């Protein structure tokens, strides 16, 4: 059993079965999430007999590291993992000096949603991943920053964080299609006895599964919500995102209003810009009309290239023009800063395939 799949209560129960007192669970929990131990032998304040029991009955992690890639500036790093059963997932760390380090975490191997502009969607769903496999992605990069932060800072020529400050569930997969396991990881990440990352430092992105949006609104933890919108009308959104045939824009907006009314928290609308597809001033005006009056922010994303598609990204001038129309309606609207395009680590590029061997021509 992967020990990362156990919360403190579950770990306590497991140790009780091994004839151990409950306080040992708290000790082990601190080793895993505070000291970042990845070997029972390193837990030297535990009796040797207990360490032997742990080694015989539990394992620390189940992911196999296959490949690591880092951008030339050293500030974006992507890891490819092999899960038990041979499915693969990817995780990305993005460092924003001097004080922010964001990890982009996968919640499924592949994705069933089939968005036409996304590399992960072309894989189909391979399998859900466990809460422990989600945790393991985070702990790997927390350990990496703790051990390598000083070297990264020296290379960068200025301070960088030595720990993860923000987490986005925007990697491979649809988090709300794996809600139970995903939420178990969220609770463990937030647990003060565990990883102790504030809920407001976590953001989950969904294609628009309305049940999940409503369920998130009812949760006690205030995790931020981002919604992949990408079109302001049903005809175009269904063309880009098959999920719109199940939950149309009207259903989606009702769920989002429920979320904002219940939580009083702002929702981010993600809008990938595709040349001559969804980037016209007319569509910008439709988008502004759709979201006006909502507690929201619009995040425009110039599309990042993926193999095997005729799509192209919007030119800079069209991105700027689109943004101005939305802003003119009084709506907060920014353009996402690109990170990791050269190692296929940017938004929409995660597909667990080799990264480009030659530079990508963006325009």
Swiss-Prot record:
Q: How is the cofactor bound?
A: Binds 1 [4Fe-4S] cluster. The cluster is coordinated with 3 cysteines and an exchangeable S-adenosyl-L-methionine.
Annotated residues that bind [4Fe-4S] cluster are located at: 111, 115, 118
**A Gene Ontology cellular-component term:** cytoplasm
The record's catalysed reaction(s) read: adenosine(2503) in 23S rRNA + 2 reduced [2Fe-2S]-[ferredoxin] + 2 S-adenosyl-L-methionine = 2-methyladenosine(2503) in 23S rRNA + 5'-deoxyadenosine + L-methionine + 2 oxidized [2Fe-2S]-[ferredoxin] + S-adenosyl-L-homocysteine; adenosine(37) in tRNA + 2 reduced [2Fe-2S]-[ferredoxin] + 2 S-adenosyl-L-methionine = 2-methyladenosine(37) in tRNA + 5'-deoxyadenosine + L-methionine + 2 oxidized [2Fe-2S]-[ferredoxin] + S-adenosyl-L-homocysteine
Query: Which residue pairs form cystines in this protein?
Result: 104-347
What functional role does this protein have? Specifically methylates position 2 of adenine 2503 in 23S rRNA and position 2 of adenine 37 in tRNAs.
HAMAP family named among the record's database cross-references:
RNA_methyltr_RlmN
Q: What is this protein called?
A: Probable dual-specificity RNA methyltransferase RlmN
């Amino acid at each position: 059993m992967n020990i990362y799949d156990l919360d403190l209560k579950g770990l306590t129960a497991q140790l009780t079965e091994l004839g151990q007192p409950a306080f040992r669970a708290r000790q082990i929990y601190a080793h895993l999430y505070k000291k970042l131990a990845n070997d029972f032998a390193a837990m030297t304040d535990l009796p040797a007999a207990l360490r032997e029991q742990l080694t015989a009955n539990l394992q620390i992690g189940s992911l196999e590291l296959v490949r690591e890639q880092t951008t030339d500036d050293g500030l974006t790093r992507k890891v490819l993992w092999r899960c038990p059963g041979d499915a693969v997932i990817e995780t990305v760390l993005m460092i924003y000096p001097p004080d922010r380090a964001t990890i982009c975490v996968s919640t499924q191997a592949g994705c069933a949603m089939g968005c036409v502009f996304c590399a992960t969607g072309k894989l189909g769903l391979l399998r859900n991943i466990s809460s422990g496999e989600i945790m393991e992605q985070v702990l790997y990069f927390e350990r990496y920053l703790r051990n390598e932060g000083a070297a990264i800072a020296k290379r960068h020529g200025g301070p960088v964080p030595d720990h993860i400050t923000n987490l986005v569930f925007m990697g491979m997969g649809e988090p709300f299609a794996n809600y139970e396991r995903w939420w178990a990881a969220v609770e463990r990440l937030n647990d003060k006895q565990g990883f102790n990352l504030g809920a407001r430092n976590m953001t989950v992105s969904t294609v628009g599964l309305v049940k999940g949006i409503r369920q998130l609104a009812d949760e006690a933890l205030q995790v931020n919500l981002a919604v992949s919108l990408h079109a302001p009308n049903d005809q175009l959104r269904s063309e880009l995102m098959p999920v719109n045939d199940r939950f149309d824009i009207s259903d989606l907006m009702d769920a989002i209003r429920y979320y904002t009314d219940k939580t009083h928290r702002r929702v981010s609308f993600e809008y990938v810009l595709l040349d001559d597809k969804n980037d016209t001033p007319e569509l910008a005006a439709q988008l502004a009309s759709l979201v006006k009056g909502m507690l929201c922010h619009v995040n425009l994303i110039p599309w990042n290239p993926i193999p095997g598609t005729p799509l192209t990204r919007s030119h800079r001038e069209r991105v700027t023009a689109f943004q101005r129309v939305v802003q003119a309606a009084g709506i907060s609207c920014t353009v996402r800063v690109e990170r990791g395009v050269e190692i296929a680590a940017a938004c929409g590029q995660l597909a667990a395939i080799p990264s480009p061997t030659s530079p990508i021509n963006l325009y």
